[in-house]
Structure formats: structure tokens, C-alpha cells
Amino acid sequence: MERTIGIDAGGTLTKIAYFNEKRLLTFEKFYSHEQHKIIDWIKNNNGIKQICITGGKSKLLQQLLTGSYKIIELNEFEATLAGVQYILKEEKHAIRNFILTNIGTGTSIHYVYNEQYIRAGGTGVGGGTIMGLSKLLTNIDHFEDVIPLTKVGSRKELDITVGDIYGGILSPIDNNLTASNFGKAAITESNNSSSDILATVQGLVGEVVTALSLQFAETKNIEHIIYIGSTLCNNVQLQHIISSYTEYQNKTPIFLQDGGNSGAIGALLHATK
């Protein structure tokens, strides 16, 4: 049986989407630098004839696959948006206008309206920031090891909050809001645990990404912000940081099941439509 797969070759992770024998949407995930594993997986799955590929690392991977398969290239955001629209329909979300924030190695933010889109902006702060600072500050360099520690860590000994500054005096904004990420590290002597450091790193990333998304949502008068990306996968703590901050600003956050695979899904759908 001839099969088609969609590949999103990102800066950190490469995601593959395909329909299995039961026509169920199925996913595989590899580190992008482990290209031999990606190629081996494709070669070991007999019947693959066509590959639609997108993402920043797509050219490099395409060079390794050319000649053996029919290759289709697809613009990265077109693939992502197609995947997001598919998931929205599957999850029965009736939303046409929204801010789409994709937290990958870095973060890109798009304004989507009536199935059209424009790039609103982005930031170099994203999943790559979490992993880079985790390595520098704690020498932990695997995402799977970082996430459990962020769940048990505390930001209280490292972040300065509005309440810390006002010291019990009535403040003009919520005392629990962060006034300075890692601000206490410069003014207190403390031997912080790895879990506290990682929780604070993730807090910084979550707040920066959310603040930018909120600014764009406010500018366009948009209620819904859809957050996707592999950085959110099984990352309940980061989702909580983003969700609480978004809701505090009276916007509605949406986290899609399999949102991190949107690019691969969109690539697959493009090749099989």
C-alpha cells in the first residue's frame, strides 16, 4: 500500500504525521540533528512513496531523501495553519479570527482572520531559551528531564513580584505579577535548587511569550489566542503560566491537542487532498 507522510523539520524537533492502517492520524518525533534516525525510520516503513516537507530544516533533510521519494515542499506557516484549522475542526472550535502563537525553538506570532494570515511578529525567546538556559545554569540538557523539575520548583526565591516591591502597601496592580524575572538573584545570597532555577526560567519564557501575544491581540481586538508548539507538549506548568496571564488580561487561551504537530499535519493534508 502506497503511503504519504508529512514532515515538519524544525530547528530542534522533526515531527512526522501519517495515517496508519486504520486511517488514524499518527505521529513520530525525532531530534532534528539525529537525521540518521529520521532516514532509517522512513526507509524501514515500506510503502512510503510521497513526502510533503516543511520547516526550517526541510532543505537539509530533503537533500538526503531526493531520488527515493516524491518530495513536495510547503511553506512553513501555510502548513501550520492548515494543521491548526484541521485540529480546530476536530475539536469543534468555531473560531475564525485569532492570534496564533507557535512556541518552538523561538516563537512566531500570527494574526489569523477569515482563513487569511499575517505575521504579527515573534521573539527569540522560546523552547530553545528554556533548554539553553537549563544547560548553562543547571547542566540539564534534555527536555524530558527539565519538565518534571519545573513542576516542583518555586520561583519565589528568584523572581521579584509586585508585592515584594510594595511590601504590603496597596499596589496599582496585582501583587502576584512578576516585576523582575530572576531579580532576587542579584540582591540575595541563596543556593537555589535546580528545580527552582528551571521553574524560573520557564516562568520568564512563558511571561515574555504571553505578553507579546496579548499586545498583538489587543491591537487587533481579538479575544482568542491559540498557543501551539512542541514546548507545550506535556508541559502543564508552562500552560498554566500562559493561561493564567492570558485570562488575567481578559483574553481566552486555547491549547490544542497535538498542536505541536500542526506543521506535520498540514503537510500531510496538503499532499493527500
UniProtKB/Swiss-Prot annotation:
Keywords: ATP-binding, Coenzyme A biosynthesis, Cytoplasm, Kinase, Nucleotide-binding, Transferase
Active site: 76 (proton acceptor)
Matches recorded under InterPro entries: ATPase_NBD, Type_II_PanK, Type_II_PanK_bac
SUPFAM superfamilies: Actin-like ATPase domain
Metabolic or biological pathway, per its Swiss-Prot or TrEMBL entry: Cofactor biosynthesis; coenzyme A biosynthesis; CoA from (R)-pantothenate: step 1/5
EC number: 2.7.1.33
Keyword Nucleotide-binding included in the entry's annotation: yes
Biological processes per GO annotation: coenzyme A biosynthetic process
Top-tier EC class: transferase
Sites where the protein binds ATP: 8-15, 105, 127-131, 143, 230
Superkingdom assignment: Bacteria
Catalysed reaction, written as an equation: (R)-pantothenate + ATP = (R)-4'-phosphopantothenate + ADP + H(+)
GO MF terms held by the record: ATP binding; pantothenate kinase activity
GO cellular component terms listed in the entry, alphabetical order: cytosol
Location of the protein in the cell: Cytoplasm
Keyword Cell membrane: no
PANTHER family: 4'-PHOSPHOPANTETHEINE PHOSPHATASE, PANTOTHENATE KINASE
Summary of the function given for this chain in its UniProt record: Catalyzes the phosphorylation of pantothenate (Pan), the first step in CoA biosynthesis.
Family per record: Belongs to the type II pantothenate kinase family.
Quaternary structure, from the entry: Homodimer.
Name used for this protein in its record: Type II pantothenate kinase
Species of the source: Bacillus cereus (strain G9842)
Lineage: Bacteria, Bacillati, Bacillota, Bacilli, Bacillales
